[in-house]
A protein has these predicted regions:
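Active-site groove signature of glycoside hydrolases
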Residues: 8-25
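Short, acidic/polar
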Residues: 1-10, 55-59
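Beta/alpha (TIM)-barrel catalytic core signal, keyed to glycine-rich beta->alpha loops juxtaposed to Asp/Glu
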Residues: 24, 28-204, 209, 221-226
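Short coil/turn segments at secondary-structure boundaries
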Residues: 214-219
């Protein structure tokens, strides 16, 4: 409750449109957490509630306490299996899925071909998907995506985002970037029209489970998708 009050003060607003529990607390029942967040809605401080890095069972339990408007989980062509498990649950409950890292932390843009493409100190160097054989496997996957992107006359990033958007209107990806030119590039994905055959080829190029390596280091993985 105090955290919400502090956020309202920092933002200089009276109400927050969407308030997330950004990581599920393994030591606190989700019913207790959402129960407290529900009171924020009742007090008029928050309009809607969201979860992040929550597994389907947790989402369902939370939704029984108060309607969940959005779930922010990782979902991309590099990380499909759990993303699609989440999507099944959110669709059952009428919840919007907000995929973060839809470009696989740049892996799916075709700009990462080896460790040398990441600057010294980049935290991605600690992520297993950017290491050793897993990196080689993922680079090979991206090359298949790049081939289709060339045929569609777009960048790999645009193709990947267009594929994600084509999965349904209840999906709102949030790609992150530090550069305006990347924002402009990503927005162009809205103009790309993919045929059923295109979608099939893209899906086959990066089927569920094809991405190698975990999303985070082992210790961090213990605190996500709970």
């Amino acid at each position: 409750m105090q955290a919400c009050d502090a956020s309202l003060k920092r933002l200089g607003i009276d109400v927050i449109d969407l308030y997330y529990q950004h990581r599920v607390d393994a030591n606190t029942p989700i019913e207790d957490t959402v129960g407290a967040m529900k009171r924020l809605v009742e007090q008029g401080k928050v309009r809607a509630l969201g979860l992040s890095e929550a597994r389907p069972e947790t989402i369902r339990r939370a939704h029984k306490v108060h309607p969940i408007a959005a779930v922010q989980n990782e979902y991309s062509l590099l990380y499909r299996k759990e993303g699609e498990e989440t999507l099944k649950a959110t669709r059952e409950l009428g919840i919007t899925l907000v995929p973060y890292a839809p470009l696989g932390r740049s892996m799916l843009t075709g700009t990462v071909h080896g460790k040398g493409d990441l600057p010294e100190g980049d935290r991605r160097l600690q992520h297993p998907r950017f290491q050793g054989d897993a990196l080689d496997t993922n680079v090979a996957l991206v090359k298949r995506i790049e081939e289709i992107a060339r045929e569609k006359r777009c960048t790999p990033a645009q193709l990947v985002l267009a594929w994600l958007l084509a999965q349904g209107k209840d999906i709102v990806p949030i790609p992150g970037t530090k550069r305006k030119q990347r924002i402009d590039e990503n927005l162009e994905a809205l103009k790309i029209k993919l045929t059923p055959e295109d979608l099939k080829r893209i899906s086959e190029a990066a089927p569920p489970g094809a991405g190698a390596g975990t999303r985070y280091p082992a210790e961090t993985m213990k605190r996500v998708y709970l």
